[in-house]
Amino acid sequence: FLPIIAKLVSGLL
């Protein structure tokens, strides 16, 4: 995934 997507996912977790 893109760094932006990964950041969003990590934020949800």
Swiss-Prot record:
Protein family according to the UniProt entry: Belongs to the MCD family. Crabrolin subfamily.
GO molecular function: toxin activity
GO cellular component: extracellular region
Entry keyword set: Amidation, Chemotaxis, G-protein coupled receptor impairing toxin, Mast cell degranulation, Secreted, Toxin
Subcellular location: Secreted
Tissue: Expressed by the venom gland.
Modified residues (Leucine amide): 13
Protein name: Vespid chemotactic peptide L
Entry function: Mast cell degranulating peptide. Induces the chemotaxis of neutrophils. Its mast cell degranulation activity may be related to the activation of G-protein coupled receptors in mast cells as well as interaction with other proteins located in cell endosomal membranes in the mast cells.
The keyword Phosphoprotein is annotated on this UniProt entry: no
GO biological process, one term: chemotaxis
